[in-house]
C-alpha cells in the first residue's frame, strides 16, 4: 500500500539496488533475478564508479517500471551521471527510497535525474513502525496498522524519539521499543 502512493501496481517490473548480496567477491556478479516476481536485484555493495556502467546497462536491458533503492545508492548513480555528463535513459514511473535518510534537496536532485516521483519512507529491520510521505504531501505519516507509535519527550531542539510496538511479531513482540530515531512532529 505504501508504494502505491508512487503509482506502484501489481506485476510492476521492479529493480532493487539494496543490501542484496549477489557475490562476495569485489569483482563478482552484481545481478540476481527473481523470476517469480520479475525483480532484478542488484548489489549495493558492488556499486562503485568503475562498475556503475554495468548497473546502467543491466537496468537499461531490464527496463523496470520502478527502482527500489537505498538513498545513498541513488545519489551515487545520480552524481555519477552528472559528473560524466550523461542522462538517465530508463523511463521510470517511480523511485522508492527508504532505510536511510534522504533530505528534500537530495530528493529534488534525484527527481531531476530520474525524471519521476521519488517516494521516501521510514522503517527499520525490526519492523516496529512504518512511515511514508503522503500522496500529496512530503510530510511523513505513520501507518497505524503496521505498529503502534508513540513519541518521547521533546528535547531542547523539539525532536522526539520514535517509540513503537510491533503488530508483526507475535512470538516475540517488541513493546514500547525505543528506536533511537528522532522526529519533529508537524501539524498536517
Where are these regions (language model features)?
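Conserved ATP-dependent adenylate/AMP-binding module captured primarily in the ANL superfamily
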Residues: 1-12, 52-62
Amino acid at each position: 500500500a505504501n508504494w502505491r502512493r508512487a503509482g506502484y501496481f501489481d506485476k510492476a517490473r521492479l529493480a532493487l539496488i539494496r543490501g542484496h548480496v549477489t557475490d562476495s567477491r569485489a569483482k563478482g556478479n552484481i545481478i540476481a533475478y527473481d523470476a517469480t516476481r520479475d525483480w532484478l536485484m542488484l548489489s549495493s555493495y558492488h556499486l562503485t564508479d568503475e562498475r556503475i556502467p554495468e548497473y546502467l546497462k543491466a537496468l537499461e536491458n531490464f527496463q523496470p517500471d520502478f527502482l527500489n533503492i537505498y538513498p545513498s545508492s541513488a545519489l551515487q548513480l545520480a552524481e555519477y551521471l552528472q559528473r560524466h555528463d550523461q542522462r538517465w535513459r530508463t523511463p521510470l514511473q517511480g523511485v522508492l527510497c527508504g532505510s536511510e535518510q534522504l533530505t528534500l534537496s537530495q530528493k529534488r536532485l534525484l527527481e531531476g535525474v530520474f525524471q519521476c516521483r521519488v517516494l521516501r519512507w521510514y522503517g527499520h529491520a525490526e519492523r516496529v513502525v512504518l512511515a511514508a510521505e503522503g500522496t500529496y504531501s512530503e510530510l511523513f505519516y505513520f501507518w497505524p496498522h503496521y505498529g503502534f507509535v508513540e513519541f518521547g519527550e521533546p528535547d531542547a531542539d523539539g525532536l522526539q524519539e520514535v517509540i513503537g510496538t510491533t503488530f508483526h511479531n507475535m512470538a516475540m513482540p517488541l513493546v514500547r521499543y525505543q528506536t533511537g530515531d528522532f522526529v519533529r512532529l508537524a501539524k498536517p
